[in-house]
């Protein structure tokens, strides 16, 4: 088995490949979020996400009350207070304005695709996964520096079930970065996003590609009503730890001998609510 590279481009690993990965995930008991309040430590680029989530929840609650007839309109006078429908419309406008000002998307930028300028005039495009034709590029990029290979079924499990949470960084026709995630219910209590794989080509590191991919994935998770985002990464992977902690992730748990190469993992977590 190959040793883990000293400077891996893979910044997070799918835990199912580790010796104790799945077992530790099942045995883990959920810890209350009050033990890890962010207290403003979340990255300024992502801080608005908590406000968006809160506003979105409030909007959904008001819509549910309106649909069930619990919100009664006020009398129609010039000095009347806004009725339920008007308040709902006001919240929708506020949410739209908040989303429009989101730092993850520039003016006119779609969630799936956008372009940024890298060093040496390399134009970096960020695109959402669209077809099976992109699978080979993702596998090549992620497998290149992995100490333990994944089967194609592992990639398909994530990408086919959550294609909206897979993004690629492209320079011309070359894939230079990729992120693969999922979003589902955790213990029937809340919606948890999971970053399974993140990789950046060694020639294109230190250009913010990894950070950009993580931001796009997190924003897509927020649109799917995500409550928290978690991932595991090797405890020796200093560049990955720095990237995630700069975005507001905190160290939640140490997993001993988590990977097949015997290296410990750190579970990182970001609360969005």
From Swiss-Prot:
**What GO biological process terms does the UniProt entry carry, in alphabetical order?**
protein stabilization
Query: Where does this one sit in the cell?
Result: Cytoplasm; Nucleus
Primary place of residence? Answer: cytoplasm
EC nos: 2.3.1.256
Q: Recorded GO terms, molecular function?
A: protein N-terminal-methionine acetyltransferase activity; protein-N-terminal amino-acid acetyltransferase activity
| SUPFAM superfamilies linked | Acyl-CoA N-acyltransferases (Nat)
Instruction: List keywords of the entry alphabetically.
Output: Acyltransferase, Cytoplasm, Nucleus, Transferase
Any Pfam family the entry gives: Acetyltransf_1
The record's Gene3D superfamilies line, in alphabetical order, gives:
3.40.630.30
**Where is region (Disordered) located?**
1-39, 62-85
Its top-level enzyme class, in one word, is transferase
Q: Which family does it belong to?
A: Belongs to the acetyltransferase family. MAK3 subfamily.
This molecule's function is given as:
Catalytic subunit of the N-terminal acetyltransferase C (NatC) complex. Catalyzes acetylation of the N-terminal methionine residues of peptides beginning with Met-Leu-Ala and Met-Leu-Gly. N-terminal acetylation protects proteins from ubiquitination and degradation by the N-end rule pathway.
This protein's assembly is summarised as: Component of the N-terminal acetyltransferase C (NatC) complex.
Name of this protein: N-alpha-acetyltransferase 30
Protein source organism: Xenopus laevis (African clawed frog)
From the broadest rank down, the organism's phylogenetic lineage runs: Eukaryota, Metazoa, Chordata, Craniata, Vertebrata
């Amino acid at each position: 088995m190959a040793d883990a590279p000293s400077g891996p481009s893979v910044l997070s690993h799918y835990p199912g490949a580790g010796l104790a990965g799945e077992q530790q995930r099942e045995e883990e008991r959920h810890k209350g979020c009050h033990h890890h309040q962010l207290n403003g430590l979340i990255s300024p680029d992502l801080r608005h996400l908590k406000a968006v989530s809160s506003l979105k929840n409030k909007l959904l609650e008001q819509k549910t009350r309106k649909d069930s007839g619990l919100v009664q309109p006020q009398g129609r006078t010039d000095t009347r207070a806004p009725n339920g429908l008007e308040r709902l419309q006001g919240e929708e406008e506020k949410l739209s304005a908040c989303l429009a000002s989101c730092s993850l998307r520039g003016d006119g930028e779609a969630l799936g695709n956008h372009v940024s300028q890298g060093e040496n005039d390399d134009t970096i495009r960020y695109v959402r996964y669209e077809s099976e034709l992109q699978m080979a590029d993702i596998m090549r990029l992620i497998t290149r520096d992995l100490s333990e290979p994944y089967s194609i079924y592992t990639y398909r499990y994530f990408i086919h079930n959550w294609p909206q949470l897979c993004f690629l960084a492209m320079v011309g026709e070359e894939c230079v970065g990729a992120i693969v995630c999922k979003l589902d219910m955790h213990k029937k209590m809340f919606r948890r996003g999971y970053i399974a794989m993140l990789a950046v080509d060694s020639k294109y590191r230190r250009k913010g590609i990894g950070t950009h991919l993580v931001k796009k994935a997190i924003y897509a998770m927020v649109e799917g009503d995500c409550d928290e985002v978690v991932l595991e990464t090797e405890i020796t992977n200093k560049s990955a730890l720095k990237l995630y902690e700069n975005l507001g992730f905190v160290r939640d748990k140490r997993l001993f001998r988590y990977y097949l190469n015997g290296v410990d993992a750190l579970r990182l977590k970001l609360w969005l609510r």
